[in-house]
Amino acid sequence: METAERVNLLGLDGAALSDLVGQWGGKPFRARQLQRWIHQRGADSFDAMTDLARDFRGQLAQQCRIQALPVNTEQRSSDGTRKWLFDVGQGNAIETVFIPEDDRGTLCVSSQAGCAVNCRFCSTGHQGFNRNLTSSEIIGQLWWAKRVLEADAGTARLGGAGNDDTRVVSNVVMMGMGEPLLNYDQLLPALRLMLDDNAYGLSRRRVTVSTSGVVPMMDRLSRDCPVALAVSLHAPTDALRDELVPLNKKYPLAELLAACERYLASAPRDFITFEYCMLDGINDTDQHARALIQVARQVRCKLNLIPFNPFPASGLKRSPSARVKVFAQRLMDAGIVTTVRKTRGDDIDAACGQLAGEVRDRTRVAQRNAGRTIPIAQVQA
């Protein structure tokens, strides 16, 4: 019972940790020391913090804890991608993915156990929704991955956070399970820790929040913690996006694009990334490309085309590679900066849209999906 009542320091940002230490009469520099031990050195025991006074360490041990989520499984892909399944209790589990590349190491972090947005092409959405993650559970994914990856690479650091080009985890994308902006109050302290020089010290350009288009929270993020922004677009018209991304019925394209333009005033990059999952016969025709060009010209953006990663419940197919290339070329010919995402980790179900974890659904999403009677292929561009 005592352990459950102790404060988990893992999810406290710098201000909250300073407030806590201040309640005990401690100086702000003590909070910074503590933060460096936890997030830069990966300490999970107060006894290891030898430059802190013994009495202070004793007080910490009595009233606080450093506790990440239990790891159920780890899988490794043939391409080097790694996926961890974290137990979040009551029969639920979330997934976190590390994607190594020559010039970076990207960690894909989850924000919810499941997702209530229920996008048609996303395995997480088909699992339904159980609960939001806490800030400790969000940042704990980075804390764990950093410890494990640096230990494996033999590069664990005893000093500062390093620079973005030398650390094992150089980029974080909030593109795992869940809609981050529907868990804003827990997301915000986690983002602040990612950016804090006494924690992970990542630049704002290297932390990306992906959203399906929660317009009010996009505005709040631009004020509170403007990091790079990616928007799950996936359709160039409201009619089609209503079917693919049901949140569009609440925040249609005109509102979403206006919010993107507002966000750019504070963004660390001079463009918004639009994510577009390529679905065979659904959103990949010449007509869709022409409509998408008109959308893209309204906001400074980059288009990221994502080959669909099939899963049984979707009833959808991946666009053929040749069609994806033609689609991308039409966008580029129109002057739209366009990339095609390379599929990584699909042999361990770690690719984009495949994360499902284990979710005890509280939203009866399967029943709602069964009630959809309009074949999506009939929706016109």
From Swiss-Prot:
Residues 101-347 form the Radical SAM core domain. GO terms for biological process: rRNA base methylation; tRNA methylation. Its cofactor is [4Fe-4S] cluster. GO terms for molecular function: 4 iron, 4 sulfur cluster binding; metal ion binding; rRNA (adenine(2503)-C2-)-methyltransferase activity; rRNA binding; tRNA (adenine(37)-C2)-methyltransferase activity; tRNA binding. Signal peptide: none annotated. S-adenosyl-L-methionine binds at residues 178-179, 210, 232-234, 309. Disulfide bonds join 108-352. Keywords: 4Fe-4S, Cytoplasm, Disulfide bond, Iron, Iron-sulfur, Metal-binding, Methyltransferase, rRNA processing, S-adenosyl-L-methionine, Transferase, tRNA processing. Binds 1 [4Fe-4S] cluster. The cluster is coordinated with 3 cysteines and an exchangeable S-adenosyl-L-methionine. Belongs to the radical SAM superfamily. RlmN family. HAMAP family: RNA_methyltr_RlmN. Specifically methylates position 2 of adenine 2503 in 23S rRNA and position 2 of adenine 37 in tRNAs. m2A2503 modification seems to play a crucial role in the proofreading step occurring at the peptidyl transferase center and thus would serve to optimize ribosomal fidelity. This is Dual-specificity RNA methyltransferase RlmN. It comes from Bordetella petrii (strain ATCC BAA-461 / DSM 12804 / CCUG 43448).
